[in-house]
């Protein structure tokens, strides 16, 4: 999934984070290490295994996580060997370089650092203390557990989770090394085990001696084997086989891990949203499964969403419940294709038309305001060309989110800047709600809010990296603006800035 400031993935899974009430502060020992720019690198370098939470003091989910994280740190401090939990305020100016370095896209983000920081993995576990402890005990142990007995097998392989088991005639050699490398790489996502006796496993051919990889799963065909131990091929097999043919998004928490994997995939994503209890639901599901089956292995992943539980997706795509049943396809470059009020006999042909390039992209946009008389002009997707890109004017454009605290603080400052340019018709100060409007990602790289760009009258587009004061904005605009009609300046390039994650 392409990295964006607040992605559909973020919107869908925020509600899955465990909630808790912050306990009153006491003077008891704190087990979570506090890091900053002065000790972050040294601390990471000296630990073989350390977990770091990137947080912001104003973040509600960070506040909910804090007491659970502290409880887990206390429990894990007595583990053998101890597991160290740490935190860093990544919103602090002097610490932001670490958020950028480790691609932190939102708060809280938890990373697992191994071997002095040489290997870094996402934390994909629970957000409550007991779950954190269980997950990290496993993560700090071997990447793959050896199955030596039937009891070992029953403990590792269950009917409720995906487990990847390598079967080898001997626990050495290139195939075994390749398997262990993938286990280490994907250990935060999946459970891995290995054995030299296939008879101990609950499903599949018991006479095989290997080398073979058998992936057990609680859906579709229950297990699948592969004998390709090429690194890339093995990783692809594991990732693709560990996701259902159709990922279901509903209230069932057992489906949530697969929803996360679905949106993390780089595949083109087809999503059908229906009322699960509505008339014709079973016919729609049946036809959708037929289409998914016929497109298996062609770079197209399928999700079936219950409209009642998909408000986050509807908000992200700008959809209405009146459009259900609907199917929307999102490509890797974030283009979207929409078919509303779809009927059973239209699903297959519409997907084929999409693959054949016959469907026009869908663009999410708020309505163009009937009146736009405030000093800071409102821009939506449908007016972006007229007000900004093709306006022939110098435009300072803020990309914001309604929930963003820094954006709210910036609003009156931009109002003052706009008022100061009211007598200069060549300058426009504008804003665009980036959560409700599509915009060209190749022109505007928005990974946090607020992000501010300046488009000169001659067409140069640069990101604003200065301080957020009236005087600094005015100085920047005056320095970079063109006199309307003057020759186009040579394009400048600037490094990407991420103000708020």
UniProtKB/Swiss-Prot annotation:
The record marks 468 as: Lowers pKa of C-terminal Cys of second active site. Disruption phenotype: Reduced seed set. Keywords: Disulfide bond, Endoplasmic reticulum, Glycoprotein, Isomerase, Redox-active center, Repeat, Signal, Vacuole. Highly expressed in flowers, stems and immature seeds, and at lower levels in leaves and siliques (at protein level). The record marks 60-61, 405-406 as: Contributes to redox potential value. Belongs to the protein disulfide isomerase family. Protein disulfide isomerase that associates with RD21A protease for trafficking from the ER through the Golgi to lytic and protein storage vacuoles of endothelial cells in developing seeds. Regulates the timing of programmed cell death (PCD) of the endothelial cells by chaperoning and inhibiting cysteine proteases during their trafficking to vacuoles. This is Protein disulfide isomerase-like 1-1. The gene is PDIL1-1.
